[in-house]
């Protein structure tokens, strides 16, 4: 089985919180199952680019359609990882390489990770790496299942997408104009992403992913209640048939 894991961080390369630890362990664990072929896509942050411990080579380059823009992307293949996981860093100097601060917190984070979400799918096509399953994480990768269903279905006809919520408090909100200006999605998907007259990319992922997982069975049950779901309890209830909890580390 071919599995692609997409995340905004992953230890030891770049880590901000618990997601980084999960992405350090999950692909490696999946790769140890006989028959699995696992690839990991991460942004090529400046802190990765300047770390001489990581040996990389450019294996593809293309343009990513982001609204009316076409933004450059280079795929950098990590060549000195010790296990069977193949790591690819997606390089764009403006969005990732030229920034020396924290991974998150820039005013254009919505644009940065909309770019990354679409670039992941474009990279899979460029590398002729069409997976059976795409596993993507939190709001930063929430547009992957949306793009997969709305734009890339012909290129990924048999691929299924699993979306994992690690922290529902951060949902990827944007102004309504973000839909037209940045996303380049068909008009009929406006409602999929709309919430309170704004764009909510996590809502879009819940609606379009084939499977939605959380970090534990307890957390999955808690998300049925407004106190824990931060406004998404109704959306999750409507999609409860595809929601499940998988405890971290299992």
Regions found by a protein language model. Give the residues of each.
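Catalytic cores of nucleotide-sugar-dependent glycosyltransferases that transfer UDP/GDP/TDP-activated
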Residues: 1-250
């Amino acid at each position: 089985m071919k599995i692609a894991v997409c995340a905004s961080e992953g230890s030891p390369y770049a880590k901000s919180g618990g997601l980084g630890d999960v992405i350090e362990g999950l692909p490696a664990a999946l790769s140890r199952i006989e028959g699995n072929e696992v690839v990991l896509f991460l942004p090529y942050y400046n802190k990765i680019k300047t770390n001489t411990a990581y040996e990389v080579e450019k294996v593809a380059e293309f343009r990513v359609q982001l609204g009316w823009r076409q933004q450059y992307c280079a795929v950098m293949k990590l060549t000195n990882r010790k296990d069977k996981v193949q790591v690819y860093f997606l390089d764009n100097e403006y969005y990732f390489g030229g920034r020396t601060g924290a991974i998150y917190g820039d005013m254009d984070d919505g644009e940065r990770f909309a770019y990354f979400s679409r670039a992941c799918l474009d990279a899979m096509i460029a590398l002729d790496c069409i997976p059976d399953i795409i596993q993507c994480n939190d709001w930063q990768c929430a547009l992957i299942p949306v793009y997969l269903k709305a734009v890339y279905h012909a290129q990924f006809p048999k691929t299924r997408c699993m979306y994992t919520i690690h922290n529902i408090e951060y949902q990827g909100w944007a102004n309504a104009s973000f839909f037209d200006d940045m996303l380049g999605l068909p008009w009929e998907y406006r409602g999929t992403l709309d919430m309170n007259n704004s764009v909510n990319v996590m809502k879009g992922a819940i609606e379009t992913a084939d499977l939605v997982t959380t970090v534990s069975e307890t957390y999955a049950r808690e998300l049925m209640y407004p106190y824990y779901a931060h406004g998404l309890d109704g959306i999750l209830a409507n999609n409860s048939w595809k929601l499940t909890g998988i405890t971290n580390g299992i």
